[in-house]
Amino acid sequence: MYFIFSTASLSSVTLIVMTNTDHPNQPNPPHLHTPVLCQEVIDGLAIEPNGHYLDATLGRGGHSRLILEAFPDVRVTGIDLDEEAIAITQENFSLMGDKRLQVWQGNFADYPGEIGEFNGIIADLGVSSPQFDVPERGFSFRHQAPLDMRMNREQSLTAGEIINHWDQTSLADLFYQYGEERRSRAIARRLVQQRPFETTTELAEAIAKCFPPKQRYGRIHPATRVFQALRIAVNDELGSLERFLEKAPHWLKPGGRIGIISFHSLEDRRVKYSFRDSLLLDVITKKPIIPQPEEEEKNPRSRSAKLRFAQRKPL
């Protein structure tokens, strides 16, 4: 099998054009990830022949693949900050022999999009399931790993840096604002007393001790909100989302649609009000689209997903 990867430097990111002339009917590669709300995304984008679409959170390429399957002349530009996700996506689409995907490595808020470039845009926010399932990335408290949580391995700020060096007040504010954690002050106080922490499991155990025993073993782990807050802070997720929401409507052709999947209220509120207040967009979904019970049963991680759509106004 012969792969061609042509790269061109683009400020601090890389544009990667992936092509493969062999095995066009290759079966699905083993690393392909099935995203949430598949049919709802495809229906909402209203994909057109010869359209150009932006997958702003490429990951393992699940949504991109669904878009490309709609018509043989559809093209997709995919964005991802995670170098490991990019590498796996390269392998996936090369094995499938699909030449219609371009990948731009970087933060979606920094993408230099052109006015009217895309027929549609999709963004699936947060951490993907494969990232959670790789222990050494440090996103999950269910695996012992270093306190990392970086999407971009080249940046210096890690979860360990925050936990072990921020002052108590700053930690409490972080847990409350980004994790909506009501016990934020008590948790911050305990962590400052017990630090330094080196691993995810060590940190999760310390957080759990801030809760009454009967609340430590419920459906939602006591450390969930703190870990969410740390991940958001490490990767500037909300700041990046706000910048993306400001830029993305300009990249749509008239009538083009943008859909965003969020997984917690901090993201969803920003998407909701950005769509509502935009002078360029008409809201399509008055209420968010949520997974059907069958999908939640097959994929429990989908249960908190909310999908909102808006459409670019005519000129």
From Swiss-Prot:
GO terms for biological process: rRNA base methylation. Its main location: cytoplasm. InterPro entries: RsmH, SAM-dep_MeTrfase_MraW_recog, SAM-dependent_MTases_sf. Its EC number is 2.1.1.199. It is an enzyme of class 2 (transferase). It is found in: Cytoplasm. Keywords: Cytoplasm, Methyltransferase, rRNA processing, S-adenosyl-L-methionine, Transferase. Pfam families: Methyltransf_5 (PF01795). One of its GO terms (cellular component) is cytoplasm. Transmembrane segments: none annotated. Residues 301-315 have a biased composition (Basic residues). Residues 291-315 are annotated as: Disordered. It catalyses: cytidine(1402) in 16S rRNA + S-adenosyl-L-methionine = N(4)-methylcytidine(1402) in 16S rRNA + S-adenosyl-L-homocysteine + H(+). GO terms for molecular function: rRNA (cytosine-N4-)-methyltransferase activity. S-adenosyl-L-methionine binds at G61, G62, H63, D80, F108, D124, Q131. Belongs to the methyltransferase superfamily. RsmH family. Specifically methylates the N4 position of cytidine in position 1402 (C1402) of 16S rRNA. This is Ribosomal RNA small subunit methyltransferase H. The lineage of its organism: Bacteria, Bacillati, Cyanobacteriota, Cyanophyceae, Oscillatoriophycideae. The gene is rsmH.
